[in-house]
């Protein structure tokens, strides 16, 4: 269960970082 939570958190963080990169490159 803990591992699933960590995976979900990692996914959320990764998506957030990707969105920030997209904003820098193409604008939001």
UniProtKB/Swiss-Prot annotation:
Expression sites (tissue/organ): Expressed by the skin glands.
Keyword terms: Amphibian defense peptide, Antibiotic, Antimicrobial, Disulfide bond, Inflammatory response, Mast cell degranulation, Secreted
Keyword Magnesium among UniProt keywords: no
Primary localisation category: secreted
Top-rank taxon, per record: Eukaryota
Disulfide-bonded cysteines: 23-28
InterPro entries in UniProt: Antimicrobial_frog_2 (IPR012521)
Cellular component terms (Gene Ontology): extracellular region
Intracellular or extracellular location(s): Secreted
One GO BP annotation of this record: defense response to Gram-negative bacterium
Similarity section: Belongs to the frog skin active peptide (FSAP) family. Ranatuerin subfamily.
Free-text function comment from the UniProt entry: Mast cell degranulating peptide. Causes histamine release from rat peritoneal mast cells in vitro. Has antibacterial activity against the Gram-negative bacterium E.coli K12 and Gram-positive bacterium M.luteus NCT C2665.
Protein name per Swiss-Prot or TrEMBL: Ranatuerin-2SEb
Organism field: Lithobates sevosus
Organism lineage string: Eukaryota, Metazoa, Chordata, Craniata, Vertebrata
């Amino acid at each position: 269960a803990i591992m699933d939570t960590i995976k979900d958190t990692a996914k959320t963080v990764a998506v957030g970082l990707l969105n920030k990169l997209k904003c820098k490159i193409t604008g939001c």
